Amino acid sequence: MSNYYYYYGGGRYDWLKTVEPTNFLKIGLPYQAHPLHLQHQATTPPSILEKFKRADILLNEVKAEMDPLMLQPETEKKLFQILSSIDMFKGLRKKVEFTYNAQIVTNAWLKMYELLNTMNFNNTSQAFCNCELPGGFISAINHFNYTMMHYPTFNWVASSLYPSSETDALEDHYGLYQCNPDNWLMQSPLLKKNMDYNNGDVTIASNVKNLALRATQRLTPIHLYTADGGINVGHDYNKQEELNLKLHFGQALTGLLSLSKGGNMILKHYTLNHAFTLSLICVFSHFFEELYITKPTSSRPTNSETYIVGKNRLRLFTPKEEQVLLKRLEFFNDTPLVDLSLYQNLLESVYFAVETIHLKQQIEFLNFGMKCYRHFYNKIKLLNDYLAPKKKIFQDRWRVLNKLYVLEKKHKLKLCAASQGSVA
């Protein structure tokens, strides 16, 4: 029996095991007290990266089994229906919205609430949420702060990429931007003529520096920085980490330029096998008393998503560190930021996270999804019927573990009335 999941289907489908992580996965990384030596193009002995490259190959081999199904609209549709059926949180979002008076209850909302409930941050009353629209993180923090922490106020600023074309819609599905314009740092393309125009693109070094400046001018201190950025890679999931390197570097750098001492950080990542990603984690380890790689239970186990969490920032950048990192973003290359041979103990902990989250949990869930596809291709209703009782048990358990309470009307975020619905 799997260490992660169990379910007894009975009869001809007694093999059926729901994919439900029993625990919030959290792997701690050691703080680095030695001096930080940033390099423009650090070299790394191949032996250090060998097991990470092997992990990448093993995971991609399993992902590749789904690739042929993505080529035909009919099989692609069926695959996503199957994966939706084995999503243990499907339906929970509506329950949370209506039972607890919650807002913008997306999957991002569930993940952020779970992170806040599990990580025991010292203060989250003032937050900068980057790469944020449609607003699930802000809404979850607002709900948590008022119902669990009982802060008298919640102050926030946020940013997201503003589309360059007037014909492209801003992802403001719930009206959080429209109804709270003073809380947002990015600007419409209509303001391009302004000297300090910033569209929220964190892959541009000048934007990053300017966003951090705007954030700290409007909100001081910043107790919590979050960033949930990710580029749509289409069907090319094997290159998801590589294609997001610059974006994830930019969103991390924005946070490190704006987060106050004593503050906490939550950053979205995917796999953690590329030398540049590993070096970025090494950089984080110099700034936070506690550093973790996490996988919330509400983060779908079929995907490679991870969240890096830093608790209690110990120091700010030196002018030289800021200069080197901004220059690297401006003239980006994906060589390591530091000499990885100086961080072998930390890299052992990162690899344990890779094994736990990707080589065990994700691969097992992907294999489970493919088995369900083969057995339930034309029997999706039957699959849903099998899983429905277990989903209810698990969702009820999640609500108890994460201590949900009703949000008072006076503490709700201001949203545009026409777009306050939730994602099922």
From Swiss-Prot:
<dbReference type="InterPro" id="IPR025807">
    <property type="entry name" value="Adrift-typ_MeTrfase"/>
</dbReference>
<dbReference type="GO" id="GO:0004483">
    <property type="term" value="F:mRNA (nucleoside-2'-O-)-methyltransferase activity"/>
</dbReference>
<protein>
    <recommendedName>
        <fullName>Probable methyltransferase EP424R</fullName>
        <ecNumber>2.1.1.-</ecNumber>
    </recommendedName>
</protein>
<dbReference type="GO" id="GO:0006370">
    <property type="term" value="P:7-methylguanosine mRNA capping"/>
</dbReference>
<dbReference type="InterPro" id="IPR029063">
    <property type="entry name" value="SAM-dependent_MTases_sf"/>
</dbReference>
<keyword id="KW-0946">Virion</keyword>
<dbReference type="InterPro" id="IPR002877">
    <property type="entry name" value="RNA_MeTrfase_FtsJ_dom"/>
</dbReference>
<feature type="binding site">
    <location>
        <position position="135"/>
    </location>
    <ligand>
        <name>S-adenosyl-L-methionine</name>
    </ligand>
</feature>
<dbReference type="GO" id="GO:0032259">
    <property type="term" value="P:methylation"/>
</dbReference>
<feature type="binding site">
    <location>
        <position position="228"/>
    </location>
    <ligand>
        <name>S-adenosyl-L-methionine</name>
    </ligand>
</feature>
<keyword id="KW-0808">Transferase</keyword>
<dbReference type="Pfam" id="PF01728">
    <property type="entry name" value="FtsJ"/>
</dbReference>
<feature type="domain" description="Adrift-type SAM-dependent 2'-O-MTase">
    <location>
        <begin position="103"/>
        <end position="315"/>
    </location>
</feature>
<keyword id="KW-0244">Early protein</keyword>
<dbReference type="GO" id="GO:0044423">
    <property type="term" value="C:virion component"/>
</dbReference>
<feature type="active site" description="Proton acceptor">
    <location>
        <position position="268"/>
    </location>
</feature>
<keyword id="KW-0949">S-adenosyl-L-methionine</keyword>
<dbReference type="InterPro" id="IPR050851">
    <property type="entry name" value="mRNA_Cap_2O-Ribose_MeTrfase"/>
</dbReference>
<keyword id="KW-0489">Methyltransferase</keyword>
